Amino acid sequence: MYIVSSKKVSRAPLHVASLCVTLHRLKCDRNQPCSTCSHRGLSFSCTYVASAANSVRKADQSRPSPRPAAGIQDRITQLEGLVLTLMHSVNHKPAPSTGAPESASVLDADLPASFGRISLENDETRYVSGDHWISILDGIAELKDHFEDDNLNAGASPAAGAATAEYQGPKLLFGCHSPTTRESILASLPQRPVTDRLVSKYFNSMDMASSIIHGPTFIREYETFWLAPSETPIMWIGLLFAVIALGTHFQQRETHFIHPSPQRHSVLEAYKDKVIECLVLGKYTKVGPYAIETLMLYFSLEHLPAADTRVDNWILVGIIVRLAMRVGYHRDPSHTPQIKPFQAEMRRRHWATIVQLDLMTSTQVGLPRMVNEAVCDTVEPRNLLDQDFDDQVVDLPPSRPDSDMTSILYLNARNKLMTVFGMITDLTTSTFPTSYRHVMRLDRTLHNTVAAIPSGLQLKALSQSITEPSETILRRIYLDMTFHKARCILHRKYLTAAQVNASYIYSRTSCIDAAVRILQHQDVLFRECQPGGLLHSGNWKITSVLNHDFLLAITILSLDLNGAMELASKSQLIETPMEQQRRENIIRSLNRSYNIWLQSANTSREARKAAEVLRIVLAKAQNSSISTPSHDQDDLDGEAATEATESEYMNSPLTLQPFLACDPGASTAIGTNICTTLDVASPSDYMEDLNDNVTSGVDFDWDNWDSHFRGQNTPNMSTMDLRFPNLDYPTDGRGSDGCI
């Protein structure tokens, strides 16, 4: 991409050469179309970039005069469209004129490439990959226009605007810290009884505390600190302040106050400032003892309260990743005999956590992950309790069995799943071509990995989990959501292609099924995080990362629903019972999600956007000719509705037998059996070596969407009743604290 300056330069102005010639640095005869474009078969895309400062000189052949630029955003939008048109013309052959199905060898040839999205909003340039929910929404013209002025959206809610104004980003990244001393830091420490309670709150609330801090060792060092505070390493003091700051955060979440107290907020910020001062005073870039642990807890302090995605937190993770690699966390400690067994095991725990943080935050901001697993060989930590070993151990004990539900068991299970998820994101963000066979291999690997999760961490119905801790239930939900998010990203590229090519029906079914299940989790989490719910004590764990998963799900379902409405408008919609049921499930899921997003629209910018997206999509669905939900479950409310939804979810064949999903490597009998159950075509019927290249990423037929949406008037959302008559909606107004 080239940035065109408005100042005069010595070379010829860019507007006298076509876009193709400019990009390829070729000669141009300035005709319309130019001979270069004609020779390359790009006559229809031969375009001249307009210049506001200079008049366009006419060539021998007349060409249309360019319209004046209406602003930098219009020019960028125009340039993006021209570049995408050029890419499509170069990389893809025209579709065959006949209606015959394409052969398996060219299945991917007509799939559009995905560049992602570059936006300039609020004087900020931002890029997200094609997998990000913002890129998906960009394909719907009326939604793109609706959110084009991000300033208006940011100021739509005074409460949200106020919250945004208060947050200035992680102070560690911006410096400007006043000089401080050890004495002033120690003077800010609360009294011993208060500190004891906050430390206890941290270890009893942070269920993954063991992956960062070894509890018994910390308590022993904690006692030593009170005997001689002035002799304690400054970085350990920073670790202590991070622990009491997180304990303060957990304590405040349990008070359930509706309006935040400035005094409580200032106390938490004061503790956070002390963490930063200790990091700076201890020169954290030298990565001395306790530096990685303190940085990881500092990230938690910035991440947990965030209602929306914060790119600063992703930058923080980048710092942690590079510092960890600087001291060799990515290489297994067994290569270095000087590292003691206790230190080696804690390094493995730290690295497993860091790898997950990297993939989690990178996906959230729509960028490739930073850790390259090809240069890493750190093995997973052993399934041990903190009480099983200490810093004096000579040989580590063997791992506990998978039946022992430890936090490290969950860490390892999620790490295995995230490894496959990382392979999927690498595939979809790569610029190298791939094949549909590779996609299906990853699909099988993903299902096999989920099937290998220990039984204690497999998803269970809530009615079967009422005697278990909330953290165990949440861990199962998190693992299942990661699985379905991976399915969405892996198969999303083929979502719309399946509407015209039955060869991709398995991908469409997988993608829609996964998105619906993610929204079912959103509904369960919203209900059970209310006071008195099974998960109320863990509602602080519903972070912006989960909201990103919910946003991804609603955009996928919205696009598929819009495709059904488009076919219905042309009388081309196939009304099979399964398709009708799937569409009703989509509408039902989007309606419930819409009401959940409304609860936090005043405190979250992303929630406000999600609610607006669903307003538009559901309004169009209500006015279309497609059938609306009609199910006995819609007449239920409260616990009955949750129970019915859960029963429908848990009894689905795909959930009970995920590892037997259609796979080209499986036997024909198994593939046919499962695919028949799912009513989808088996990929084994058409999975041959695909020689045609497919550009990476996931995208949709934007031209099709644009032509459909731009010809319609956006309804007045403020005066329209978007609720379907057969659906039940919560009326108690709970959830205003934005726990989801």
From Swiss-Prot:
GO-annotated biological processes: DNA-templated transcription
Keywords noted in UniProt: DNA-binding, Metal-binding, Nucleus, Transcription, Transcription regulation, Zinc
Location of this chain's protein in the cell: Nucleus
DNA-binding region: 25-46
Pfam families for this protein: Fungal_trans, Zn_clus
MF (Gene Ontology): DNA binding; DNA-binding transcription factor activity, RNA polymerase II-specific; zinc ion binding
Span list, region Disordered: 625-645
Main location: nucleus
GO cellular component: nucleus
Function: Transcription factor; part of the gene cluster that mediates the biosynthesis of macrophasetins, 3-decalinoyltetramic acids (DTAs) which feature a tetramate (pyrrolidine-2,4-dione) unit connected to a decalin fragment and that have potent bioactivities.
Descriptive protein name: Zn(2)-C6 fungal-type transcription factor mpsB
